[in-house]
Amino acid sequence: MKKLAILLTLALCAALSGCGRPAPSLGGGAPVPQEPAGSVASSGEPDDPAPPAGGQTATLYIGTKAKGFAEYPMTYQGELTPEALIQGIADLTGWDLTLAGEVVSGKGGMSVCLSNKSALFTGPPEPQKEEFFVFGLDDLAETLLDSIQKTLQEGFTLEGGDPDALDIWYSVEGERPLELPGLGLSWPIDQPYQWESAVITG
């Protein structure tokens, strides 16, 4: 019995001495992969994408001076140009707004030269976009010309200025006055455009 007590005492001492040993270093073990701080697992549909870096917004105006205009946003990169606004109207409406040259800007106004390939001479696209449906050449011509005029005036008038003070002149290829034989109307090349100032030629 005395021997058994001695053996139990020795075993207890050995166990206690083992508990005092330093823990083995974890430095040599394989690293445990962890999620990067702040990362979140993707699930479901992504949120609406942010606008392109450096993108800016301009406004397109579609309609007529007589009936009013609807406004549509257009995103663009870099410097805003008259050609970019006119192309924006074309992309939005489906109308062919091919130009015969660059828009010429001068003191107090801009000169827009339309190509013979433009919708003003070839008609609206087929099929037309329902939102921009026009009835006949007269409706198309007034809407097209007024929309370009209004969009350029609003786009290039400084804050606090009067958009109507920015005159817009129209001409066609060959630096000829704008004339629409199908409607019997023309506009003098040396006078700013106003739909109601058309000269009746037919």
Annotate the PLM regions.
Residues 5-8, 18-202:
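Bimodal "functional hotspot" detector
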Residues 13-16:
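Bacterial Sec-type N-terminal signal peptides, specifically the leucine/valine-rich hydrophobic h-region
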